[in-house]
């Protein structure tokens, strides 16, 4: 019960934050939300979570979940994108992680005038809710997102908290391998989404 109340207060706080701070300029509704290019795996996953995947034109290579993403055009790696590759898909809206780059490409996209939103990230339960709320606000489905968060996400976060508080939970040393480059593993470093996932 305590955790449910905590999450409710958290959700209300996030929504008030979106309305009253500088996040508004990033999270306010876009003029055209039908043709989206995504640079960042978590954003792609959120759009699928919200059942809004039909809006997606293309994705970056970190967007590998769910498996249906393999059918979408790729724009390359989130940190080493090209403006030409992105703009060739004729997007009306680009949603990117805060490590989207390089900076020159972001500047080139802004010069063309395509609506680009770089969404900040915090690797916590609050950060997940805040990110979903922001993306939902951009594409104009806040009410739908609230229901999804309440019905689908909250129970999972509650179960996670229950497990962390249980006696069987023990911290272990782990490493998250994102992919293999030849024989060398690409691992999640400090400050990445992967590292945040491990900590949670």
Predicted regions and their residues:
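Extracytoplasmic substrate-binding proteins
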Residues: 26-35, 104-186
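A short, structured surface patch at a secondary-structure boundary
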Residues: 34-105, 117
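Alpha-helical, coiled-coil/dimerization segments enriched in small aliphatic residues
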Residues: 62-65, 149, 185-200
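Hydrophobic/aromatic ligand-binding patch that stacks against planar heteroaromatic rings
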Residues: 85, 108, 197
């Amino acid at each position: 019960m305590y955790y449910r109340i905590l999450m409710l207060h958290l959700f209300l706080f996030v929504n008030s934050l979106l309305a009253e701070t500088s996040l508004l300029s990033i999270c306010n509704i876009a003029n055209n939300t039908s043709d989206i290019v995504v640079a960042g795996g978590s954003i792609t996953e959120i759009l699928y979570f919200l059942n809004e995947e039909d809006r997606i034109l293309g994705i970056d290579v970190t967007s590998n979940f769910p498996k249906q993403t393999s059918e979408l055009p790729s724009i390359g790696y989130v940190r080493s994108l090209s403006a030409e590759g992105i703009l060739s898909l004729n997007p009306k809206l680009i949603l990117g992680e805060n490590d989207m780059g390089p900076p020159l490409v972001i500047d080139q996209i802004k010069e063309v005038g395509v609506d680009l939103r770089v969404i900040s990230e915090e690797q916590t339960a609050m950060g997940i809710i805040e990110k979903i709320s922001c993306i939902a606000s951009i594409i104009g489905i806040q009410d739908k997102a609230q229901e999804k968060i309440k019905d689908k996400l909250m129970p999972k976060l509650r179960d996670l908290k229950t497990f962390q508080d249980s006696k069987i939970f023990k911290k272990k040393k782990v490493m998250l391998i994102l992919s293999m480059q030849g024989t060398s593993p690409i691992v999640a470093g400090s400050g990445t989404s992967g590292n945040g996932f491990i900590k949670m």
